[in-house]
Amino acid sequence: MLTRIGGLLRQAESTDNPHEAEAFMEAAQRLATATSIDLAVARSHNASREKQVAPAQRVIRIGEAGKKGLRTFVKLFLVIAFANDVKCDISQSSTQVFAYGFDSDIDTCEALYSSLLIQMVRASDTYIKSGAYRNETAVRTVTETIGRKKYKRQEVVVVAGVTARLNFQTAFAERIGKRLESVKQEAETKAIEEESRGAGTAVVLRNKAIELKDFYTSTSKARGSWRSQSANAGYSRGARAAGDRAGRAARLGGEPELGRGSTQLGR
């Protein structure tokens, strides 16, 4: 399955036509979803509980502690995981993600993430170097303390490069998530309508979701919540729009084989 997906991703990478690239990417996600359904049906037919494949936990390394922008990297992995039936916990430092799911689904997530991470960073670098964000202003709320009282006021500021980058990458990840989820839903709907697999596909998918939820609940030790952006992160409308466009045009692949490639960017 990964080899076939790899072929689709290489086709997406090699074409200069954005519509073809999008079609190949969606085909890759469609194949991943169809394979995931087939494996779920196969598991439901396995009468031997001892040999039945079960969900597992895997640690995904995102980056080194202190590295800027890790939250948007995590955000990208999360949207990919959501579209591929994988639940996640995030370390407080955002340096790693704990992925919960079936091995084949986690493999798909790692493959997609490795390709899209590079594209997201390259696209945001190009945007920042263009200087387009420097023409944009934003309204920032500032809290001042005078005596014993605190006052809030708003001021207009020029969008900083770090703010533009974070907004760009956040919008990129959100658009990718929407694209992958749309393809997944279409593939699942088609499989349920066809019902040619000999088993109630809808029931199988529901049982898979329940099994994963039970595994996650019994295994996860996560406490608290995680935010994709810090509380003081600014907002850039222009960077968001640019990131969304890049997410629409994103291609996958570029690797000779799909597998567990590196999920960290070298610097």
Model regions: which residues?
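Short amphipathic alpha-helical coiled-coil/interface segments
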Residues: 5, 21-35, 169-176
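Extended, helix-rich structural scaffolds rather than catalytic motifs
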Residues: 1, 37-267
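Terminal, compositionally biased segments used for targeting/anchoring and flexible tails
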Residues: 10, 31-34, 43
